[in-house]
Regions:
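Short catalytic/signature loops enriched in Gly
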Residues: 3-4, 17-21, 26, 238-325
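Helix-to-loop junction immediately C-terminal to a conserved catalytic motif
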Residues: 61
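Conserved ABC transporter NBD signature motif
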Residues: 69-77
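Conserved ABC ATPase "signature" region
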Residues: 77, 128-146, 255
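Conserved ABC ATPase signature
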Residues: 151-155, 159
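A short, proline-enriched helix->beta-strand linker immediately N-terminal to the Walker B motif
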Residues: 170-174
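P-loop NTP-binding/switch modules centered on Walker-like glycine-rich loops
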Residues: 181, 185, 189-266
Length: 325
């Protein structure tokens, strides 16, 4: 296994509710999340909207400060860095945003959008050097260099996302966070963007944290998968293990919901009920209110994490293979 470049330890993000004189229970958006990321690896974080996957990523890169926990980046405690040290470390962490339409400034040319990170960090000495870096990056992501003076409105969604990707990689970061980078694109364009991300990973040795609710997309890019529900990690494993041997009932339901040509979706593939409020999560197992296999014991205590070997583990008191027979 390649070297670990990111380690997240017991990360929590709670939001305080109420007023100065009347406190209420905190919203536990992220609750005790831990994982590692290896060099040149793609870790997908999946789950329904509201499961905590985006807040997890915002907390680990400190767009919002975590309540507690540690983030170790390249052997350094990223959560304790301040000022110049924090700014320096952030050069190694970049984001590709979900919406290629709203994430690009309509008043800026392609040149200035892609050059924004190197302008902020002042990594070039001459205008010629800046131009060369931008053109080189445009070629890497499959953009015609003659488009350098154009504006975002002149491009399709896929081309705009390539501009966003170019902006993210121009500083040659170690880690790129992909926040649902293809969800706003047509299916035919999604495949091209996924292939581009894989190509860039090979060429630049990038590691990805890939946030998605679409396991059909995740299957084509992820090395490992982290399944989240209501701020908790409920299953983690290699892409192969998660797809071939899903062990948590929530994971199984997500996989069953992937559309398949020629196969009708049954009612059993749907999760009953709504996602509970993170300000008032269920006692015991957080999934028991929607789980088709839930027992009385599930309501009383949090499940221990079961290790299935090869980095595959899940949090459930049940042996799901036996329960589903």
């Amino acid at each position: 296994m390649s070297e670990i470049i990111l380690e997240v330890q017991n990360l929590k993000k709670y939001y305080q509710q109420g007023t100065l004189f009347q406190k209420r229970e905190s919203v536990k958006a992220v609750d005790d999340v831990s994982f590692v990321l290896h060099r040149k690896e793609t870790l997908a974080i999946v789950g329904e909207s509201g499961c905590g996957k985006s807040t997890t990523v915002k907390s680990l890169i400190r767009l919002t400060e975590p309540t507690s926990g540690k983030v170790i980046l390249n052997g350094e405690d990223f959560t304790s860095l301040k000022g110049k040290e924090l700014r320096e470390a952030r050069k190694k962490l970049k984001i590709i945003f979900q919406d290629p339409y709203s994430s690009l400034n309509p008043r800026m040319t392609v040149r200035d959008i892609i050059a924004e990170p190197i302008d902020i960090e002042k990594t070039w000495k001459t205008r010629g050097e800046r131009e060369e870096l931008v053109l080189e990056t445009m070629k890497l992501v499959g953009l015609d260099p003659t488009w350098i003076n154009r504006y975002p409105h002149e491009f399709s969604g896929g081309q705009r996302q390539r501009i966003g990707i170019a902006r993210a990689i121009i500083l040659k970061p170690d880690i790129v966070i992909c926040d649902e980078p293809v969800s706003a694109l047509d299916v035919s364009i999604q495949a091209k963007i996924i292939n581009l991300l894989k190509q860039l990973q090979e060429e630049l040795n990038i590691s990805y944290i890939f946030i998605s609710h679409d396991l059909g997309v995740v299957k084509h890019i992820a090395d490992r998968i982290l399944v989240m529900y209501l701020g908790h990690v409920i299953e983690e494993g290699s892409c192969e293990d998660i797809f071939n041997h899903p062990s948590h009932p929530y994971t199984r339901t997500l996989l069953n919901a992937i559309p398949t040509i020629g196969v009708e979706m049954s009612e059993n593939t749907l999760i009953e009920g709504d996602l509970p409020s993170p300000s008032n999560p269920p006692k015991g197992c957080v999934f028991h209110t929607r789980c088709p296999f839930a027992k009385e014991e599930c309501k009383l205590k949090q499940p221990e994490v079961k290790d299935l070997g090869n980095g595959h583990h899940y949090a459930c008191i049940l042996n799901i293979e036996n329960e589903s027979e």
